[in-house]
């Protein structure tokens, strides 16, 4: 069977080495004679797995000692509500920067839980010469006392990524569901980072939360116990039965990432993948990117065909060529190639060759 390259935005492809190992030990994990899905989450063998997973993630991201690492339920949307309930209390306010679909969704959830009067927003995307770009205002000039500032540094639907640091007088909370572990970041600049696992970490059903000590003293609202960060810390992410198979696969992804050189090497690869794909889009009049170069996502490359009548044919022929899940999000249309950490350079090169051939045939 010829190679299939999966460009799905999430759940996304996992490293083949991780999938092969999971397949090999599916029925007999760690010499136990049973699957990892069948062992107690409180067994010494599984506890050892969780401890190694946290240690590897701390090493990969250089997470300081005053941060807790939590493995939780709920995905990104679950964290939309958890952030509000854990930190706003009865009288807190928060500021949300909006740069695309997911940050808008976070605002909607926050307003539903806390009320619109407690949530302020700033739209940081504008269109300049037909391209969407990000402009972050001087936040130090805002004379308000917010519990936190929330933003999404990579918008999967819109293909927009923010690479600059946020200079905020309030604790910064970042939804890094789609770009965590894709490039080096300074964790100490954030009060909290959360990420749904299903793009760069593992399968859906798990979310990673990295939270600074001082955030946990903020007043909270009544909420579900399984989304309470304080209870999660006190119980080592095991207040209730966690998604053990997803945790296991996340641990294997962290191990794999270390084996290929860590985040620094992955960042170099991701830069090269994005460079080759955007270069193809820019060099051919057949395709167009609607995002300014400085804000083009390295993870989610969105583009349009100048002749939209060819969209269906493009997708059909791509499927035949082994290039799957290239259809853009229904809200924006066009195409989207998600090239997360697990996507090899070969997959991007194969896509570029297909795009060049398709353009030559239909120009």
Curated annotation (Swiss-Prot):
Q: What is the catalytic activity of this protein?
A: O-phospho-L-serine + 2-oxoglutarate = 3-phosphooxypyruvate + L-glutamate; 4-(phosphooxy)-L-threonine + 2-oxoglutarate = (R)-3-hydroxy-2-oxo-4-phosphooxybutanoate + L-glutamate
The record describes how the cofactor is bound as: Binds 1 pyridoxal phosphate per subunit.
Binding, pyridoxal 5'-phosphate: 76-77, 102, 156, 175, 198, 240-241
The listed locations are: Cytoplasm
Modified sites of kind N6-(pyridoxal phosphate)lysine: 199
Provide the residue positions that the database annotates as binding L-glutamate: 42
Which family, according to the similarity comment? Belongs to the class-V pyridoxal-phosphate-dependent aminotransferase family. SerC subfamily.
Q: How would you summarize the oligomeric state and partners of this protein?
A: Homodimer.
What name does this protein carry?
A: Phosphoserine aminotransferase
Gene name? serC
